[in-house]
């Protein structure tokens, strides 16, 4: 392998690392060791794996058909459903999952309202 091709490959790797910022990727981090629940300080604690303030949710929300349902907190929703299926006798065990899903949805709709107040379009006709 020539030196020039090695340099090109290294540059591509560096570019990919830079492009993996939260705004450019929709990847859900599933490895618990890599999730930063306290990103930005104590006031920004995050108790769910989804990223409801990602800019891509706005476009998916506006591009969905009127009769379709879009959930930006899909992973939290699925976790709460799985907990209910595991603990059918006692739903109080799943309260943390319910709260995380509710918080995720609240963050998503707060982002939506904030974008509208700032005059940012893209949320559909409403």
Swiss-Prot record:
Residues 1-29 are annotated as: Disordered. It is found in: Mitochondrion intermembrane space. Residues 11-29 have a biased composition (Basic and acidic residues). Belongs to the COX23 family. Required for the assembly of cytochrome c oxidase. It comes from the Eukaryota. InterPro entries: COX23 (IPR051040), Cys_alpha_HP_mot_SF (IPR009069). Disulfide bonds join 73-104, 83-94. GO terms for biological process: mitochondrial cytochrome c oxidase assembly. Keywords: Disulfide bond, Mitochondrion, Transit peptide. This is Cytochrome c oxidase-assembly factor COX23, mitochondrial. A motif (Cx9C motif 2) lies at residues 94-104. Its main location: mitochondrion. Residues 1-10 have a biased composition (Polar residues). Residues 70-112 form the CHCH domain. GO terms for cellular component: mitochondrial intermembrane space. A motif (Cx9C motif 1) lies at residues 73-83. It comes from Debaryomyces hansenii (strain ATCC 36239 / CBS 767 / BCRC 21394 / JCM 1990 / NBRC 0083 / IGC 2968).
């Amino acid at each position: 392998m020539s030196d020039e091709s090695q340099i090109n490959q290294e540059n591509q790797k560096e570019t990919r690392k830079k492009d993996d910022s939260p705004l450019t990727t929709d990847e859900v981090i599933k490895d618990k060791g890599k999730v930063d629940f306290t990103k930005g300080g104590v006031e920004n604690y995050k108790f769910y794996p989804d990223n409801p303030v990602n800019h891509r949710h706005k476009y998916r929300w506006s591009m969905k058909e009127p009769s379709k349902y879009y959930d930006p907190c899909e992973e939290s929703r699925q976790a709460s459903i799985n907990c209910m299926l595991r603990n059918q006798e006692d739903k109080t065990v799943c309260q943390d999952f319910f709260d995380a899903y509710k918080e995720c949805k609240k963050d998503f709709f707060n982002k939506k309202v904030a974008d509208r107040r700032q005059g940012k379009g893209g949320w559909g006709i409403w």
